């Protein structure tokens, strides 16, 4: 039975009208004077730290920790500014699905498994009032690889449970093939939602346990069995 539910953020819980991508571009422009840093870059399912390294290397720059520190400080400032003016929201069905999970006889714990850096995740979810709904998370600060972030999330969940969590006691919810892959990396069950850039059929090709248009389309009890 599922004891821990790990949620992706962008494209799964919320949409921000590309606030994060815009903030990335503005930060690269301000810190490194790259004028088209995010053009033709795929963000879906990727990690902030991995993307930053990729973009810097594409511009002939091998990043240092100081580079990351300067970049992400600027990115977070831009993110807060942009979120305040671009709108966005929580996807339909998210609140009801989480409420349904909380109402189950054996209520699972909620965590985050995301490619955002921790402070970026906090800014985004606080903006929509749901940061407090998650006990803990694993983030791009922990590793550049999403599969490794999943392992961190499993370890932190186990620590909170006071015992090792088996993979099949964990449910990973995400909107990209990379979310499915990272769930499989820890032996978790995977619920793929087509609220991001991929259709239900595209997600099904990667063989999640469930693939739905939105979290409104699946009873919470079904995924906890």
Regions found by a protein language model. Give the residues of each.
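Active-site neighborhood of HAD-like aspartate-dependent phosphohydrolases
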Residues: 1-44, 50, 56-58, 200
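Active-site nucleophile and cofactor-binding loops and adjacent substrate-binding regions
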Residues: 40-45, 114, 141-142
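Phosphate/oxyanion-binding active-site loops and adjacent basic polyanion-contact surfaces
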Residues: 16, 20, 90, 143-149
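Asp-based, Mg2+/Mn2+-dependent phosphohydrolase catalytic module
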Residues: 1-3, 63-66, 95, 99-102, ...
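Membrane-embedded alpha-helical bundles of multi-pass transporters/translocases
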Residues: 4, 75-76
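Short, acidic loop-to-helix structural element flanking the phosphoryl-transfer center
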Residues: 6, 80-112, 118, 134
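Helix-loop "lid/cap" segments that line or gate small-molecule binding pockets
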Residues: 49-63, 153-155
């Amino acid at each position: 039975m599922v004891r821990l539910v790990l949620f992706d953020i962008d494209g799964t819980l919320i949409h921000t009208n590309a606030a994060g991508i815009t903030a990335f571009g503005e930060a690269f422009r301000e810190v490194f004077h790259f004028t088209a840093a995010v053009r033709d870059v795929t963000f879906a399912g990727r990690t902030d730290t991995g993307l930053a390294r990729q973009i810097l290397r594409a511009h002939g720059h091998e990043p240092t920790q100081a580079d990351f520190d300067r970049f992400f400080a600027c990115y977070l400032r831009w993110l807060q500014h942009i979120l305040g003016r671009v709108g966005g929201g929580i996807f339909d069905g998210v609140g009801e699905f989480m409420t349904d999970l909380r109402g189950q006889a054996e209520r699972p714990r909620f965590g985050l498994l995301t490619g955002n850096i921790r402070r970026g995740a906090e800014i985004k979810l606080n903006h929509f009032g749901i940061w407090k709904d998650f006990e803990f998370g694993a983030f791009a600060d922990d590793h550049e690889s999403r599969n490794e972030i999943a392992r961190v999330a499993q370890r932190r969940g186990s620590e909170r449970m006071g015992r090792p969590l088996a993979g099949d006691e964990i449910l990973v919810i995400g909107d990209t093939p990379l979310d499915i892959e990272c769930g499989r990396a820890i032996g978790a069950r995977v619920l793929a939602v087509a609220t991001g850039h991929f259709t239900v059929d595209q997600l099904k090709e990667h063989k999640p346990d469930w693939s739905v248009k939105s979290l409104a389309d699946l009873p919470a009890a079904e995924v906890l069995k």
